[in-house]
Regions:
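Short, surface-exposed loop/strand segments
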Residues: 17-19, 30-38, 43-55
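Generic structural signal for well-ordered alpha-helices
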Residues: 54, 78-81, 104-107, 135-140, ...
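Core AdoMet radical
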Residues: 15, 35-45, 60-74, 85-103, ...
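Flexible mid-to-C-terminal extensions adjoining Fe-S/redox cofactors in radical SAM and related proteins
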Residues: 2-14, 34, 229-316
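Radical SAM enzyme [4Fe-4S]-AdoMet core and its adjacent flexible, acidic
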Residues: 120-239
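N-terminal pre-triad scaffold of radical SAM enzymes
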Residues: 4-32, 62-66, 213-217, 221
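Residue-level signal for mature regions of secreted extracellular proteins and peptides
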Residues: 17, 21-24, 201-203, 248, ...
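Short cysteine clusters
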Residues: 24, 28-31, 208, 221, ...
Length: 316
């Protein structure tokens, strides 16, 4: 098998995301992966290919964050975690709809744990899709066995009171429970603290120069500079299995779709050191509008709508 050259990340990079899958067993009406399109139909790499690709990364102190969709639905999830070089830190974003005993059997507590101001396993709770009592019990069970877990919840404007009830339950159990800003248009209002407010869901499109601080890898191994490109499947920088590493990681690059940016890239948030004021991308040289944005929406139309969760089903 051909040896792949190392991928060396720029010094200013802050985050590595490995989207093992865009699929999920939950059916949240506000899920960003289902704002139209066929994301979940994206080809999945095998576990061996993920291991081969991720192990070429020269990540320094940046953990590889396994996420999705729901990363644990990948049929090779456990072998991927076990196969990543031990000197590379791993974080995990998950809804934790899994067998905790199987998880503990296959992943030692110390493998997804590092010295950081937040949990390495960040669990999401989704109202109407999960039983909060069962989820909190599962989190507590793993914490009591030495795993680094916390709960992160999208602070949906329709569920504010319920979210705080669950938050108090978690805090009473000694579980770290944090709120994440709800992002995007909802009932005629755009939500989220944005560094470039007119970059998201704008009525007009502009050109600009953009520089990212993140390495985003989709389920097929394609590398993207931002979530907007990732979800739209456009402007790939290459593939994690390409013999030659991408030559333009973290460089200033022209972009013709300012106005179609994704909130995850533009929002003001904490960096990996929990210092507030960071955003995933920097933007400069914004032009005057040159076209209307055909993707502008007053309200997100989600392809799921409101459906019951499909828990316990593993994707192929």
């Amino acid at each position: 098998m051909q040896t792949l050259k190392p991928i060396v990340l720029p010094q200013h990079f802050n985050y590595i995301a490995a989207f093992l899958s865009f699929a999920c067993m939950l059916r949240c009406s506000y899920c960003i992966n289902h704002h139209g399109g066929d994301l979940v139909k994206k080809r999945w790499m095998s576990g061996d290919d993920w291991i081969r690709g991720l192990n070429r990364l020269q990540a320094r102190d940046i953990p590889i964050t396994l996420q999705g969709g729901e990363p644990t639905v990948h049929k090779h999830f456990y072998s991927i975690v076990q196969g990543i070089r031990p000197d590379i830190d791993i974080d995990l974003l998950t809804n934790l709809e899994l067998d905790p005993d199987e998880f503990m059997q296959k992943i030692p507590a110390g493998r997804i744990k590092r010295d950081s101001p937040y949990a390495s396993i960040r669990v999401s709770y989704h109202k109407d899709q999960q039983d909060p009592f069962k989820l909190l019990k599962r989190v507590k069970y793993l914490k009591d066995h030495g795993y680094s877990l916390g709960i992160w919840v999208v602070d949906h404007p329709d569920y504010l009171a319920h979210t705080r009830e669950v938050q108090q339950m978690a805090l009473d159990m000694g579980i770290d429970f944090r709120l994440k800003e709800f992002l995007g248009p909802h009932k005629g209002q755009n939500y989220g603290t944005m560094r470039y407010p007119d970059a998201v869901n704008a009525k007009q499109v502009r050109s600009c120069d953009c520089r990212t601080t993140e390495l985003l890898i989709d389920p097929a191994g394609d590398i993207f500079r931002c979530h907007a490109d990732l979800y739209a499947n456009r402007f790939s920088l290459g593939n994690i299995l390409d013999e030659e590493p991408p030559t333009n990681l973290g460089e200033w690059m022209p972009c013709q779709v300012y106005g179609k940016c994704n909130s995850c890239d533009i929002k003001v948030k904490n960096n990996r050191f929990q210092q507030f004021g960071h955003s995933s991308v920097e933007i400069r040289n914004i032009s005057a509008p040159y076209a209307g944005n055909q993707e502008y929406v007053k309200e997100v139309v989600n392809t799921y709508g409101k459906q019951d969760a499909v828990v316990g089903v593993k994707s192929a």
